[in-house]
Amino acid sequence: RGAYGNSTNDVRNDYYFYSKGNVIYTGAGHSSISNADEIQLFVNAIVAAANVTAVKPEVSFVKSLNPSAEVENIRYYMTDQKLWTNTDQNTLEKDMDFYINVKDYNMVSADLNQDDLDKQEITMQFYIEDDKGEVQDGSGTNQRLLDITRQIQNITEYGGNESGINVSNDGMFHTRKNNAFGFSVKNIEDYLHNSSNNDYKSSCKIYAKISSTVYLYNVPKKQTVWTSIDLKQRQLFDLD
């Protein structure tokens, strides 16, 4: 509107505003700003440049509690019997430990003022494929996923204190750090049991849902990503 609506796309003599990826080009600010339209254009450029800094975090399952650890996409679990029995533990591991590495570049952005930096955070939730669960929007799968965040109760942090991070009343883990985190799924056999066939699932995925909220000029911007690790069965054979 106004000067913007009258632009003839002449970047030499008129206003312009152009974006490519996370780079904003504008015709204001190259010389002294002398009128309200130029001030508005310059402010809009600053706001737009700040908005594109709200990027999605990068998350992956890894093999150990270390930000430099190798990515882990598949974990094999061992059973010593083909069929499920109610009296014996058939998986060799009662509990299974997992690790995720979270890289959120919003957490280290130099473009944000201190008030915005103080309010930003990362939340974590964990799910496992289970018929008792529900399909989750954004997860990238049509499988039913059961929220096991509260059952996990506590996660450990690379270089953090021994007490770790407890699940909050909202059913999520909260942090403000890029880091590697570890958690344990108790009684993993309960989720690996295929009740319909009285045997074990050949594949069962665990999902991590990571949401990053960053404030840009006091306006929250939320980005959510999902990642998973696939648990696949291997069976020990009785050689006697």
Show where each model-derived region lies.
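Extracellular ligand-binding/catalytic regions of CAZymes and related secreted enzymes
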Residues: 8-13, 18-115
